């Protein structure tokens, strides 16, 4: 199912709600062909609004897709012997009480090597959570 569907809370074409499908256990992975950032946003929305653990929600965009395409032995979980592709994510509150938050990628590692470092946490706007 599409991660943007999770963000919107419904399908833009009137099809199955991804949130409902995940909650019922009929959707086991998320994708996005036009808004890749939706993958991280959807994980946090499912955790916050659908009472999924972060590990369950992240499996929808990591382990489960890796299994589906036959590369689970190489990627998809942090396991000895697998490639270490890691994102460090920080939730930034958009309101003082942090009721509305957005996930921000602060570091990215590919194959265990640092490939991205954000300076966003040093910026004075937003409310850290």
What are these regions, as identified by a protein language model?
Residues 1-89:
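His/Asp/Glu-enriched, well-ordered alpha-helical/loop segment
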Residues 67, 80-129:
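C-terminal cap of metal-dependent C-N hydrolases
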């Amino acid at each position: 199912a599409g991660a943007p569907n999770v963000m919107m809370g419904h399908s833009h074409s009137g099809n199955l709600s991804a949130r409902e499908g995940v909650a019922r256990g009929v959707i086991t992975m998320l994708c996005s062909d036009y808004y890749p950032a939706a993958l991280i946003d959807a994980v946090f929305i499912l955790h916050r609004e659908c009472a999924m653990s972060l590990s369950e929600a992240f499996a929808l965009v990591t382990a489960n897709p890796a299994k589906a395409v036959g590369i689970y032995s190489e990627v998809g979980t942090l396991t000895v012997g697998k490639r270490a592709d890691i994102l460090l994510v920080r939730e930034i509150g958009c309101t003082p009480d942090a009721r509305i938050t957005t996930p921000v990628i602060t570091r990215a590692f590919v194959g265990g090597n640092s490939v991205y470092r954000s300076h966003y946490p040093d910026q004075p706007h937003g409310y850290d959570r």
